[in-house]
Regions:
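C-terminal regulatory/oligomerization modules of transcriptional regulators
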Residues: 1-8, 132-151
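N-terminal leader segment of winged-helix/HTH proteins
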Residues: 1-38
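Charged, amphipathic alpha-helical coiled-coil/dimerization segments
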Residues: 2-3, 79-138
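N-terminal positioning helix adjacent to the helix-turn-helix/winged-helix DNA-binding module
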Residues: 15, 43-44, 106, 133
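Short amphipathic alpha-helical segments with heptad-repeat character
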Residues: 16, 20, 24, 68, ...
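Short, locally clustered residues in the helix-turn-helix/winged-helix DNA-binding domain
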Residues: 20, 24, 49-55, 115, ...
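N-terminal helix-turn-helix DNA-binding core of bacterial DNA-binding proteins
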Residues: 28-70
Length: 151
């Protein structure tokens, strides 16, 4: 009985290591493609993605919460995106210190270009996984992340 438990435990540890290795590989691949093909970064892509999903804009604190990073990290990225004309700062009435960040039309078009290629790269990487298998993997991984939501 103990050997089965030990074996199951070791299989789960190896599974976790494989998930981690795969995630790191995909992230590195995406970072390189964005840098080489578009001279941009994955964090900038992530910020633009969050803003694309919020057409009325987001406060820095909201953006930090969505991306799970510090306000300081977000502020530097937003500053550069504003300089490039991809993001605009919108004043919040009644709060002189806070503002919303929103994609400009130029930024939205640029993000759509990035997103189209991003999806293509992911599809290339995962091409050996059927749609049904991808759904099953997603379900299994969701069962793990839902445990974190209980806290």
């Amino acid at each position: 009985m103990i050997s089965t438990i030990e074996t199951d435990s070791k299989v789960r540890v190896r599974t976790w290591l494989k998930i981690l290795k795969t995630s790191n590989f995909i992230e590195k691949y995406l970072r390189e493609r964005l840098r080489n093909d578009h001279r941009t970064t994955l964090p900038r892509f992530d910020v633009m993605s969050a803003l694309q999903r919020s057409p009325n804009g987001l406060k820095m604190s909201e953006l930090s919460g969505v991306l799970k990073v510090s306000n300081g990290n977000i502020t530097g990225i937003i500053d550069r995106l504003v300089q490039e004309g991809h993001v605009e700062r919108i004043a919040i009435q009644g709060d002189r210190r806070a503002y919303l960040a929103a994609l400009t039309d130029k930024g939205s078009k640029k993000f759509q270009e990035y997103a189209l290629e991003h999806e293509m790269w992911i599809n290339e990487l995962l091409s050996d996984i059927s749609s049904d298998d991808a759904k099953m993997i997603t379900s299994l991984l969701s069962s793990i992340t839902e445990k974190g939501d209980l806290k």
